[in-house]
Curated annotation (Swiss-Prot):
Gene3D superfamilies: 3.40.50.880, P-loop containing nucleotide triphosphate hydrolases
Protein name stated in the entry: Cobyric acid synthase
GO MF, one example: ABC-type vitamin B12 transporter activity
HAMAP family, A to Z: CobQ
KW Cell wall biogenesis/degradation (keyword) present: no
Record lineage: Bacteria, Pseudomonadati, Pseudomonadota, Gammaproteobacteria, Vibrionales
UniProt keyword annotations, A-Z: Cobalamin biosynthesis, Glutamine amidotransferase
Ranges of residues in domain GATase cobBQ-type: 249-436
Highest taxon, organism lineage: Bacteria
UniProt-annotated catalytic positions: 330, 428
Keyword Transmembrane appears in the UniProt entry: no
Any Pfam family the entry gives: GATase_3
GO terms for biological process, alphabetical: cobalamin biosynthetic process
InterPro entries xrefs: Class_I_gatase-like, CobQ/CobB/MinD/ParA_Nub-bd_dom, CobQ_GATase1, CobQ_N, CobQ_synth, GATase_3, P-loop_NTPase
Length: 480
């Protein structure tokens, strides 16, 4: 019999993604062939799958917890916002179209067919599926045609547990209120509650747990402790927590663009004890750094306009005058060039924007999206190191500069300015390659930094979650 379980939350960021990742690792360690599943995800941080499709990064991390390759069927509906009211809709890894919120709400009945198709494929292949909901199942205005939470659970007939973050406060109101707002049939499939991120003496919580169980008739399956320094990729909110030592060798600043994407590119910098990574927000200056990194963006021309509104273009020029280095990744790479054309209105109104003019490149946004995992060699300062990464972009750039990356298929990638201070690349995640990070640090200011094994750090984090789940949850109540 298949092991199926859906984790829903009282709020966004309640701990659904982490709990699913941990449950996946618990099962994988027992030899169970398990896969993650999230019917609908809204995120600007995405990953490339084995099929050359696109899914939310949380599902890619969960696949790692299962010790399998990520697949488009693990997240069949991905919504990538490109404005306050509109988003790109991605079905089974491929971009379908742009829709406003009302249009997608009406499209959900069609999207449910795609969701159930992917779910059926995973059920055919795996012994267990750990499913993640989205946001809260109790959003009254979103319940009609729901495909992300109870709408899916009812259609697929799967049991549900509800998780809440006690660190935010109000955990009993969150859990009791969420359950109360569900229909009788939805309430019946809730098997219990999990309380996440608890600090302190569990005895002080016991009276509240007893009250909750008495009022709802549902068991509290367990209370997970606050896991300090848990270094897993954040899907939405930018994480600024660092691991600094007294010996900082490199200072990096990243401007927070309005549609910043794949900020997980910078986790490897944030977690290094000798690198001081600082995110710079609205009204702040890009200063006191060795390296400025322009991140990816879901709306490159709009974010380029925003960058100029903040005066960051002037900060970049001043930084370069004093010998600093600038790196652009994906959308940030496009901004560094001479122009960005969007003749088809792929990311908004059709038109052309003047770039920062720091690289001799010209970019045209196309209707076909490049989705590929890439391996190659990075050549800087007369040194050559292996590099891996992934590409997710709709632009094609004409480059009239030295190209520092040679892909395994022989294609050249990226651009390095003649002055040697400015570099751009379409490769997300290439800083995760230890040798590449060390070479980039040496390029920036000549410092030698020993890179950490980023994959190993993620593995350790996943195992910590699984250990906590095995210790603090009554898994027998879940059949695990």
């Amino acid at each position: 019999m298949k092991k199926l379980l859906m984790v829903q939350g009282t709020t966004s960021d309640a701990g659904k993604s982490v709990l699913v990742a941990g449950l996946c690792r618990v099962l994988a360690r027992k030899g169970v062939k398990v896969a993650p599943f999230k019917p609908q995800n809204m995120a600007l941080n995405s990953a490339v799958t084995k099929e050359g499709g696109e899914i939310g990064r949380a599902q890619a991390v969960q696949a790692q917890a299962c010790r399998i390759e990520p697949s488009v069927h693990m997240n069949p509906v991905l919504i990538k916002p490109n404005s306050d009211t509109g988003a790109q809709i991605i079905l089974q890894g491929k971009a379908l179209t742009n829709m406003d919120a009302y249009g997608f709400h009406n499209y959900k009945k069609v999207a449910m067919d795609t969701v159930m198709d992917s779910f059926a494929r995973l059920k055919d292949e795996y012994q267990a599926i750990m499913i993640e909901g989205a946001g809260s199942p109790a959003e009254i205005n979103l319940r009609q045609n729901d495909i992300a939470n109870m709408g899916f659970a009812e259609e697929a007939d799967v049991p549900v547990i509800i998780v809440a973050d006690i660190d935010r406060g109000g955990v009993f109101a969150h859990l009791y209120g969420t359950l109360a707002l569900l229909s009788p049939s939805e309430q019946a499939r809730v098997k219990g509650f999990v309380i996440n991120r608890f600090r302190g003496d569990i005895k002080l919580l016991e009276s509240g747990l007893d009250w909750l169980e008495e009022k709802t008739g549902k068991p509290v399956i367990g209370v997970l402790p606050f896991l300090h320094g848990l270094n897993l990729e954040a899907e939405d909110a930018i994480t600024s927590q660092q691991a600094l030592s007294d010996e900082v060798k490199l200072k990096v600043v990243v401007p927070v663009l309005t549609r910043i994407s794949n900020h997980t590119d910078f986790d490897v910098l944030r977690l290094h004890p000798q690198i001081d990574l600082r995110y710079v927000g609205k009204g702040e200056r890009l200063e006191h750094a060795d390296l400025i990194i322009l991140p990816g963006s879901k709306s490159v021309r709009d974010d380029l306009r925003y960058l100029r509104e903040q005066g960051w273009d002037k900060d970049i020029l001043r930084h370069l005058r004093f010998g600093g280095k600038v790196l652009g990744i994906c959308g940030g790479y496009q901004m560094l060039g001479e122009s960005i054309r969007d003749p088809f209105g792929v990311e908004g109104e059709p038109g052309e924007s003047v770039g920062l003019g720091l690289l001799k490149t010209r970019t045209e946004l196309t209707q076909d999206k490049c989705l590929i995992n890439t391996k190659g060699q990075l050549s800087l300062n007369g040194k050559h190191v292996n590099v891996t990464g992934y590409e997710i972009h709709v632009g094609r750039s004409q480059v009239n500069e030295y190209q520092p990356i040679t892909k395994d298929d022989g294609q050249l990638e990226g651009a390095l300015s003649e002055c040697g201070q400015i570099m751009g690349s379409y490769l997300h995640g290439f800083l995760d390659s230890e040798a590449a990070l060390e070479l980039i640090c040496e390029w920036v200011n000549g410092v030698r930094i020993k890179a950490q094994n980023h994959q190993q750090l993620k593995e350790q984090a996943i195992d910590r979650i699984a250990d906590a789940i095995e210790e603090h949850l009554d898994l027998s109540q879940l059949g695990i």
